[in-house]
Amino acid sequence: MDIIYLLCFISLVLLLVFMYFTMLRKNEFEERLALYRPQHQLSQKREAYLKKVRKFRLWVTGIIIVIFLAPLFLYLVLMIQEGVEVLHLLFPDEIIGETLLSLLIPFLVYYLLSYVFKRNEKALHMLVEQMSDSDFDLLLKVKDSLFVLTRYNPPFVLCNKQLYFFIFYAIREIDPAKITDINWGYSKNGLYVKIKSPKVTRITMSRETLSYLLQIVEQYNSKIRTF
């Protein structure tokens, strides 16, 4: 059991480190996002889009709850029904400790995923509020190019001549004119795209979605290198 406990502990430490970089360490855009509050009434078309973004987030959160929190609730019900003393008679203290540690990890994963989807929803609201009509029309085209289950979770957004890439652990703001080259290839999760600006950004998207990204970058940088 010591090996199981060690693996759980290492997984917990790695998860906490990842949570730090995702939730606490913010770039300039994410710092602005943290201070953002909706200020303007949006058009009916934009409000309709944001409502569907919210529905997507709630739908994903519901799935996450079922997958990650159901085991924790079952364990708590068992503790209430049997009583803590009975559990101590049936299981040594170290087994109970390992079980609680293994249940803590799914709860933290749920918390992290919930944070990411809430952050992305807030960022989309902020960008949709600030973008031009042409940028919003492009956002809708990108939406239609995505897989039906991810249409309201775009990999990138163009707003006021800036590109915003939605990576899991961060949202990066990049000037398309500063992108030097774009490489791509196929992976298990789809089309794998590598963007240099000069910092390297890696993200996955469909080929059709990539075509919109290339159009944007070529519009601001005609010397862009693509592979």
Task: Show the residue positions of the predicted features.
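Domain-scale macromolecular recognition modules
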Residues: 172-175, 192
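Short, surface-exposed beta-strand-loop junctions and turns on beta-sheet-rich folds
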Residues: 170-173, 199-201
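Acidic, Ser/Thr- and proline-rich intrinsically disordered linker/docking segments
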Residues: 125-138, 181-227
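Eukaryotic intrinsically disordered, low-complexity regulatory linkers and tails enriched in Ser/Thr/Pro
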Residues: 1-134, 151, 227
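N-terminal recruitment modules of adaptor/scaffold proteins
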Residues: 111-172, 181-183
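Hydrophobic transmembrane signal anchors and adjacent membrane-proximal interface regions, especially
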Residues: 1, 89-91, 95-96, 137-140, ...
